[in-house]
Swiss-Prot record:
It comes from Neorickettsia sennetsu (strain ATCC VR-367 / Miyayama). Heterotrimer of A, B and C subunits. GO terms for molecular function: asparaginyl-tRNA synthase (glutamine-hydrolyzing) activity; ATP binding; glutaminyl-tRNA synthase (glutamine-hydrolyzing) activity. It is an enzyme of class 6 (ligase). It catalyses: L-glutamyl-tRNA(Gln) + L-glutamine + ATP + H2O = L-glutaminyl-tRNA(Gln) + L-glutamate + ADP + phosphate + H(+); L-aspartyl-tRNA(Asn) + L-glutamine + ATP + H2O = L-asparaginyl-tRNA(Asn) + L-glutamate + ADP + phosphate + 2 H(+). One of its GO terms (biological process) is translation. It comes from the Bacteria. This is Aspartyl/glutamyl-tRNA(Asn/Gln) amidotransferase subunit B. The lineage of its organism: Bacteria, Pseudomonadati, Pseudomonadota, Alphaproteobacteria, Rickettsiales. The keyword Ion transport does not apply. The keyword Protein transport does not apply.
């Protein structure tokens, strides 16, 4: 249990998260503008996004499907009736003066996320669909603010947890698992580095053992799990200091400064009344058919926990290897691609998690960007399986292929790396090594068995690493016994 030790008591932290995940869609929620905030300023904007008079919203049903997939993946209830409402507030990058969202009737209610360490279930209150705002840019010119509406109207789903989270570590575990599920069900790429997932943390504290909830403050727009953990920890400690000094916590909205590691109040938190919610008159209620939801359910993929259990139970992977693979959706897909090509699960897992991951980490890139595709890894592993190259050589071939020096087959052919499997050729290497090392040979005959490993190494070295270790061992032992018998 996570506590903050104050001067007068031990304090518990109570956390609820609102996660804003960008829905995986080519187009915006209510217009056909592309979802691309990397384009030049205000170039991915339609008349509706810019709030020109008389232009009406048209719902992108692909976004509805993705939200349903998220809801199913999280075990929520899909509501066949939901309503889009206008949430009114003023901000320069919100051209309509309101955000189209869902409040009273969200598309998903309920659900949960199971985390580990500790093993715990975090309940989800609701998931609703809404549009993103634009972007205010303050650092282009002194005293001026510029508005880029490329992001305005990008589809989001807001996933609201219950206040079941009790520590910064649990908050990070929840977000990581939530991201993974969204990626598996193809509802969102959920890449925090690209701004595709942001968190608002509602934080309060209470004395250990109490059951009521304290006054909460909301920390907005946390764009990494590191800043999420730091912001929660700082805000919780701040609240403890205020309460222990006799003060009271004011309900307010805050931002987290990553440079000073402190939270900064921006405004008192608005109530639902101040937002003046009402049903958007330009959008009909969203009414879904049961068959539509059932068809989506039938197309749902295997979820992370199910896949991890299958890897352990059916493929006999270690729990560690299964977890490493499943914790990265693209690594899991890479692994499954190798299985479909006929490779043994444990071998495929080792080459991905040890050899390929080592190269990826060294270069600082993700597996989806790997120069060595599953097809190239298949080519490499077939060379190993057929004993055309040794595992030792294969590791070097993998490195060279990763660096763009060709396919595994091309590298093996170009550099004459095929393993020597001819007994007569290996016997020639063995005789040369034994003739060059009479002292070591004598020590072996006198009972020093460890000399065998030395002699095997010398034979492989003489073959430039191309001799099969298994055959070297076999031929060497036969020649040693022949010489022992010859010497009487």
């Amino acid at each position: 249990m996570y506590y903050i030790d104050g001067k007068t008591a031990r304090w518990e932290v109570v956390i609820g998260l609102e996660v804003h995940a960008q829905i995986l869609s080519k187009n915006k929620l209510f217009s056909d503008a592309p979802c691309d905030s990397t384009k030049g300023p205000n170039t991915a904007v339609t008349l509706f996004d810019a709030a020109m008079p008389g232009v009406l919203p048209v719902l992108n049903f692909n976004c509805v499907e993705k939200a349903i997939r998220a809801g199913l993946g999280l075990g929520g209830k899909i509501n066949l009736y939901s309503v889009f409402e206008r949430k009114h507030y003023f901000y320069p990058d919100l051209p309509h003066g309101y955000q189209i969202t869902q409040n009273s009737y969200p598309i998903i209610t309920g659900g949960c996320v199971r985390i580990r360490n500790p093993d715990k279930v975090i309940r989800i209150n609701r998931i609703h669909i809404e549009q993103d705002a634009g972007k205010s840019i303050h650092n282009l010119a002194p005293g001026k603010t510029y508005i880029d509406l490329n992001r305005a109207g990008i589809p989001l789903m807001e996933i609201v947890s219950e206040p079941d989270i009790s520590s910064p570590a649990e908050a990070v575990a929840y977000v990581d698992k939530l991201k993974l599920i969204l990626q598996y069900v193809c509802a969102s790429n959920a890449n925090m580095e690209k701004g595709e997932l942001r968190c608002d943390a509602n934080v309060s504290v209470r004395r250990g053992g109490e059951s009521g909830l304290g006054t909460r403050c909301e920390i907005k727009n946390l764009n990494s799990t590191k800043s999420l953990a730091q912001a929660i920890e700082h805000e919780a400690k701040r609240q403890v200091e205020v309460l222990e000094s006799g003060g009271t916590i004011v309900v307010e909205t805050k931002l987290f400064d990553v440079d000073t590691l402190s939270t900064i109040a921006t405004r008192s938190k608005e109530s639902a009344t101040e937002y003046r919610y009402f049903a958007d008159p330009d959008l009909l209620p969203l009414v879904l058919e049961e068959k539509y939801v059932e068809d989506i359910k039938a197309s749902m993929p295997e979820l992370p926990d199910e896949r991890e259990n299958r890897y352990v139970r059916e493929l006999n992977l270690s729990p560690y290897d299964a977890n490493v693979l499943v914790s990265n959706v693209n690594a899991s897909r890479y692994f499954d691609a190798l299985l479909e090509l006929g490779h043994q699960p444990k071998l495929a897992a080792r080459w991905i998690t040890v050899e390929l991951f080592g190269l990826l980490n060294k270069r600082g890139i993700k597996i989806v960007e790997s120069p060595v595709t599953p097809a190239l890894m298949d080519e490499l592993l077939r060379l190993v399986h057929s004993a055309e190259i040794s595992e030792r050589t294969a590791k070097e071939v993998l490195r060279k292929s990763f660096e763009g020096m060709g396919s595994p087959k091309e590298i093996v052919e170009r550099e004459s790396l095929r393993q020597v499997t001819d007994d007569k050729v290996i016997l020639g290497y063995v005789k040369e090594v034994l003739d060059e090392n009479p002292t070591k040979l004598g020590e072996y005959f006198m009972g020093k068995e460890k000399m065998l490993a030395f002699l095997v190494g010398q034979v492989i070295k003489k073959s430039n690493g191309n001799a099969s270790p298994h055959l070297v061992n076999k031929v060497l032992l036969e020649e040693l016994e022949r010489r022992r018998a010859q010497n009487g």
